Amino acid sequence: MSTQANGSTPEPIEKVSIIVSKGSLEGVYPGLIMANGARMEGIEANLFFTFFGLDAISKAKHENVKVATVGNPGLHLATWAGGIPGVSSLVTHKLAQEMEKLDIPPIPEFVEMIAESGAGLYACKASVDLFGLEREDFVDEVQDVITVGEFYGLAAGGQIIFT
C-alpha cells in the first residue's frame, strides 16, 4: 500500500457512488467498468444514471448505445466526418469487436452482471420526469428512481465519481 505525502497510509475506499450522465458508448462504459472493478475488490458501489446516461438502463435504448462521433476529440476525426451517416454505427461496431476480444460485455449484459454483484443501480428522478419516463421504461436491474438528495444519502461516507 502506498503512503501519502505526510507519511500516513491512506484509508481504504469502502464505497463509491458513480454518476453516469452521458448516453454515448464512451460515456457509459467508464462508470460500468469502475462499478464492476469496485465490486470485484469488495467495495460497495452504486450507479446513479442521470440525463442521457439513462440510455444505458432504458429498455428502449440500452442495446443501441453508440459512440458519439461528432465533435469527439478522442476519435481524432474531423467533426464533419463524424456526421456522415453510418460513421457512428461503424465506429461503434469496431469498438464493440475490440471490447469483445477483451471480454468486456455489451451494456445490457454488463448492467445485469453489475447488479448481480450487489451494486445498486438508480435512475435520477429529475431526469426521469424531464424526459417523461416511468419506472417501467427501465431494465429490471434498476432498483429505484431516486432524487438527488436520496442519492447523496446513499453516497454518504463514500466517494462520489462523476463520469
Where in the sequence are the language-model features?
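Short, glycine-rich nucleotide/cofactor-binding loops
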Residues: 18-28, 57, 98-102
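Short internal beta-strands
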Residues: 45-51, 122-125
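N-terminal glycine-/serine-/threonine-rich phosphate-binding loop
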Residues: 1-27, 33-36
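N-terminal beta-loop-helix "entrance" segment that forms/cooperates
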Residues: 53-66
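Histidine-anchored nucleotide/phosphate-binding helix
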Residues: 29-42, 47
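Polar low-complexity intrinsically disordered regions
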Residues: 11-15, 72, 157-158
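A charged, amphipathic interaction segment
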Residues: 90-145, 149, 153-156
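A glycine-rich helix N-cap at a beta->alpha junction
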Residues: 65-106
